[in-house]
Design a protein with these regions (language model features):
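Ligand-binding pockets and gating/stacking loops
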Residues: 1-440
Length: 440
């Protein structure tokens, strides 16, 4: 068995040398990796087929998005003093989110998220894994766990990997953890708002499909010598991987990244920017069965000139997020797709007016907001509350473990079930976590 594992590793390495695949596990079946997740006891709960995670890297302000506090005064709300009503009575959000205000019946706001950490990496790890660091294990993020239970090990047949990040990954503390590289996300790179979306290892910038085909013909001619050797099983395996890789690049798999067939009107609704078009790409990936997609949006770490940044960021968020919800609903996909909006923490409720911050907000993990929609989550609700200045949780504290366990349960993954790990430890998927029962 050890010899077989080594052979599989070598064949994968050779494929990588040839530039055929851009991410771990991209084209290989179960033979190249370890334990089959089907052997794990999974208790069927919900029926959500996909999760779209809208990740606001840097930490978005809760006061300037989904938990406005105009009554707290200028030192807290700054220039955003006029929150707007939504299409749900009693729910108001920031005035720079008018399109989302019209979609409030589709999402619920959690205003009492808390974990207490003000460090980016720690906050990201807590929010992505539902665990606090401290032991010798680096736990897998939510995307990797969903990939374990709903990816290749559970019958996923898609050419596109089951865990996609648009466009840059967050890093090792929010990815595959101890599950290993098979469950690492495939980060596309590139920018889907560009004329040609250059996807890392799939759609090369400046390389036409015809040139890719010519390269394949050349590779076939070079392979002929090795394949002519009798009984050379490794070349046969490599050839199979090559076929899968090129089917991804030139076949139906690669077509999902070509948005030229999307109507201009719809693309405009999402916003002709990286975030908006990434949201549209996420919908396309859901349509072909990809179970977990992360859309990373940077620029939320607003220590300085916070409000100037928000005037640029919030309209992009408003268009992309609202268009995604409406588009999923119009296509009958929202009922089976969970959308979660969050960052690693919130930002200080009290504005830092003094120099050098000049109206900035710092990191704040004591109290912040998250948003969930679809896949079994009810819309038009508020979970928990912050105090009158947004500084502390005033009721119904919600941990990242509670949020993640609820997403797992609605995805058909038992949070109390066993979680495979390399040390053979008795670990559970998300133990001792509460559920957001009021909106499930």
């Amino acid at each position: 068995m050890a010899e077989q594992r080594n052979i599989n590793f070598l064949s994968r390495r050779e494929a990588l040398k040839l530039g055929l695949i851009g991410a771990a596990g991209l084209t290989f079946g179960k033979y190249a990796f370890g334990e089959d997740a089907n052997s794990l006891a999974t208790k069927k709960r919900g029926n959500a087929k996909a999760v779209i995670e809208l990740w606001m890297s840097g930490g978005p302000s809760h006061l300037d998005t989904f938990d406005p506090k105009p009554q707290a005064g200028n030192d807290y709300c700054g220039p955003f003093k006029n929150p707007i009503s939504t299409n749900i009575d009693g729910i108001q959000i920031c005035e720079l989110l008018p399109l989302l205000a019209k979609q409030a019946d589709k999402f619920s706001i959690i205003r009492s998220m808390t974990h207490g950490s003000n460090a980016h990496e720690t906050g990201t790890y807590i929010m992505k894994t539902g665990r606090k660091p401290g032991d010798n294990l680096v736990y897998p993020g939510m995307g990797a766990v969903v990939s374990l239970f709903k990816g290749y090990d559970s019958g996923y047949k898609g050419l596109i990997p089951p865990y996609i990040v648009l466009t840059a990954a967050e890093g090792r503390f929010s990815e595959e953890g101890f599950l290993g590289p098979r469950y690492k996300p495939f980060a596309t790179g590139g920018d889907p708002s560009q004329k040609r979306f250059a996807v890392s290892g799939i759609v090369a910038e400046g390389i036409s499909d015809q040139r890719q085909k010519s390269r394949r013909e050349l590779l076939h001619s070079l392979d002929s010598l090795g394949k002519a050797m009798p009984g050379n099983k490794e070349f046969e395996k490599l050839d199979a991987c090559e076929d899968k890789a090129y089917n991804l690049i030139l076949g139906d798999g690669g077509k999902v990244f070509d948005m030229s067939n999307e109507k201009d009107e719809l693309r405009d609704k999402y916003g002709r920017n990286k975030f908006g078009q990434s949201c549209l790409m996420a919908r396309r990936l859901v349509e072909i069965g990809v179970p977990y997609i992360t859309v990373n949006s940077g620029g939320w770490d607003t220590h300085k000139q916070h409000f100037e940044m928000m005037r640029r960021k919030l309209p992009e968020l408003d268009k992309g997020f609202s268009a995604l919800l409406a588009d999923l609903a119009d296509r009958g996909l929202l009922e089976s797709t969970i959308v979660v909006w969050a960052g690693e923490f919130g930002r200080t409720p009290k504005v830092l007016w003094e120099s050098p911050w000049n109206g900035g907000r710092g990191h704040y993990g004591n109290c912040f907001s998250a948003v969930v929609a679809g896949g079994g989550f009810k819309g038009g609700r508020i979970v928990g509350a912050s105090d009158d200045k947004g500084e502390e949780v005033a009721g119904r504290p919600v941990s990242s473990a509670d949020l993640i366990a609820s997403i797992y349960e609605l995805s058909g993954i038992d949070p109390d079930g066993p979680l495979s790990n390399p040390k053979g430890l008795n670990l559970q998927v998300m133990p001792s976590a509460n559920r957001l029962k009021e909106i499930m």
